[in-house]
Amino acid sequence: MSLLTEVETYVLSIVPSGPLKAEIAQRLEDVFAGKNTDLEALMEWLKTRPILSPLTKGILGFVFTLTVPSERGLQRRRFVQNALNGNGDPNNMDRAVKLYRKLKREITFHGAKEIALSYSAGALASCMGLIYNRMGAVTTEVAFGLVCATCEQIADSQHRSHRQMVTTTNPLIRHENRMVLASTTAKAMEQMAGSSEQAAEAMEVASQARQMVQAMRAIGTHPSSSAGLKDDLLENLQAYQKRMGVQMQRFK
């Protein structure tokens, strides 16, 4: 796996799924391929994206700044600086300075990532902030190692949180989660179906499923009523899958 592929993988792992994730992936690919060289426009685009947390925007801004060639005097962006200040916690800043001194002696991506993984996400973000604000300089490889370590820490906590939700025994949370998944699946199928004539059946099934979820939420239903909702939806679309050759199993 190449260095840039690895960076792209780690960065995308902390971006929520959805159309915006596909857009960001495309931007990263363009930047890494040298196709997008307007850092100013890129940062303006990033700043106005919805859904993304300030920290995710800060990390993406840091990656874009590292990768896109720019004039020396180009001003640093406030939204990135604010995201990479370690929540203003002096402890994070102290640890970030110690980490920076270690990284300065490092020259490889994997070496930097290994060192950085023993620090908290707050300290890692602060260290990125030091480099972003030109208070310290490390090689691009080392900076990317720092980025990937930060993303790994964030993705780990997201995974723990997700696992807790999936394994929860609370029937209300499980009920809502099943309805959200069914609704999301229906939406994705509507998007994939597009405007072809054969897609009418799939669109109809997906639309009915979404209406059903809305009705269940509006009137309040027993937590067990959503059991198998998404699977039923997928089974109804098997005929469409065979005709269109679309791999609907991926949604399971």
From Swiss-Prot:
Its main location: virion. Residues 165-252 are annotated as: RNP-binding. The keyword RNA-binding applies. This is Matrix protein 1. The lineage of its organism: Viruses, Riboviria, Orthornavirae, Negarnaviricota, Polyploviricotina. Most abundant protein in virion. When expressed alone can form virus-like particles in transfected cells. One of its GO terms (molecular function) is structural constituent of virion. SUPFAM superfamilies: Influenza virus matrix protein M1. SMART domains: Flu_M1_C. Pfam families: Flu_M1 (PF00598), Flu_M1_C (PF08289). Keywords: Host nucleus, Membrane, RNA-binding, Viral matrix protein, Virion. It is a peripheral membrane protein. Belongs to the influenza viruses Matrix protein M1 family.
